[in-house]
């Protein structure tokens, strides 16, 4: 799916170098079709890097996807130029009267922070409440899953003693589920989190359908039966080097991190890691766009009436 972004967004040239189909706004205006409107709430510190990762996964289908980037933290960023944020991001007040086909809420490095201590926790709750009436389907990633489970279902924050970092095997529980259509029975995906997601806890607190689990019984992929919300507890959007960058950052900070599991060849950080989850990540986002967004969203977004027909 060609993603539709502003002509000057840095991701345009970055993704074109990878032969990813990126359609600038000026070119898209000549096509008489309605693009899917997808809002990305980017909570990661390195916003440009995160943009590249998610836009890459949203680019593999014949329809246009019109991307809008959202920020809710007004504090000065230490990792992203203010000019970039001012040029390419909107504030919630700018879009709160609009409707969107899809919303993606990214992860955030807040696994050890209590929810009420998160600087923008009230804004997170505001966006999630707003999305019930203004978004067809929302996809939560990693920390955003934990936040959404607390806000929407009252599930207390579950924190691991040690950080889960590495590339783990998962297995699908419902081979004919739309979100896992085309998945291998077992597949790999990266994790980088302190949050804990026991499958039994999800089943006890919610009516969400768990579609894939880790070998240890953690929920990886789950969704509501009406397709309005979906959750992925890992980071299928990560580049091959992202876990390495996080590991060496923590080493330099003197944190003595564990070597990411099943990631570096021969478990040696001096070896170059390879992405073993790329096909899974692409298929997951393609399925979400197709079955959870495109097939149930109304043609006229002025009238939000998602349907499963």
UniProtKB/Swiss-Prot annotation:
Entry annotation: catalytic residues: 142 (acyl-thioester intermediate), 235 (proton acceptor), 237
Keyword Glycosyltransferase on entry: no
Entry's Gene Ontology BP terms: L-methionine biosynthetic process from homoserine via O-succinyl-L-homoserine and cystathionine
Enzyme Commission number, as recorded: 2.3.1.46
Site (Important for acyl-CoA specificity): 111
Residues holding substrate: 163, 192, 249
S-S bridge residues: none
Domain of life: Bacteria
Record's subcellular location: Cytoplasm
Keyword Repressor set for record: no
Recorded GO CC terms: cytoplasm
Keywords, alphabetical: Acyltransferase, Amino-acid biosynthesis, Cytoplasm, Methionine biosynthesis, Transferase
A single GO molecular function term of this UniProt record: homoserine O-succinyltransferase activity
Catalyzed reaction equations: L-homoserine + succinyl-CoA = O-succinyl-L-homoserine + CoA
Top EC category: transferase
UniProt-annotated site: Important for substrate specificity, residues: 192
Role played: Transfers a succinyl group from succinyl-CoA to L-homoserine, forming succinyl-L-homoserine.
Self-association and partners: Homodimer.
NCBIfam families linked: metA
Protein name (database record): Homoserine O-succinyltransferase
Natural source organism: Shigella boydii serotype 18 (strain CDC 3083-94 / BS512)
Gene (UniProt): metAS
């Amino acid at each position: 799916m060609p993603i539709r972004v502003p002509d000057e967004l840095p991701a345009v040239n970055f993704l074109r170098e990878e032969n990813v189909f990126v359609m600038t706004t000026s070119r898209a205006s000549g096509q008489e079709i309605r693009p899917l409107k997808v809002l990305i709430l980017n909570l990661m510190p390195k916003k440009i890097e995160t943009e590249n990762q998610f836009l890459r996964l949203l680019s593999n289908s014949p329809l246009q996807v019109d991307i809008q980037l959202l920020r809710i933290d007004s504090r000065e960023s230490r990792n992203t130029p203010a000019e970039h944020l001012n040029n390419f991001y909107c504030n919630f007040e700018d879009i709160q009267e609009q409707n969107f086909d899809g919303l993606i809420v990214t992860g955030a490095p807040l696994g050890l922070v209590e929810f009420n201590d998160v600087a923008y926790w009230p804004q997170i709750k505001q966006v999630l409440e707003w999305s019930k009436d203004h978004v067809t389907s929302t996809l939560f990633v990693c920390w955003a899953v934990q936040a959404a489970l607390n806000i929407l279902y009252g599930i207390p924050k579950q924190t691991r003693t040690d950080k889960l970092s590495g590339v783990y095997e998962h297995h699908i529980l419902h081979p004919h589920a739309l979100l896992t259509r085309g998945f291998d029975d077992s597949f790999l995906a990266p994790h980088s989190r302190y949050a804990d997601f026991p499958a039994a806890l999800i089943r006890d607190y919610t009516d969400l359908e768990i579609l894939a689990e880790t070998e240890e019984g953690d929920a990886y992929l789950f969704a509501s039966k009406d397709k309005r919300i979906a959750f992925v507890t890992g980071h299928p959007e990560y580049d091959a080097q992202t876990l390495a960058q996080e590991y060496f950052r923590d080493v330099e900070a003197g944190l003595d991190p564990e070597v990411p599991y099943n990631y570096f060849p021969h478990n040696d950080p001096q070896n170059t890691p390879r992405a073993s989850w790329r096909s899974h990540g692409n298929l997951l986002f393609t399925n979400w766009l197709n079955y959870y967004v495109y097939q149930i969203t109304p043609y006229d977004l002025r009238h939000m009436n998602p349907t499963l027909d």
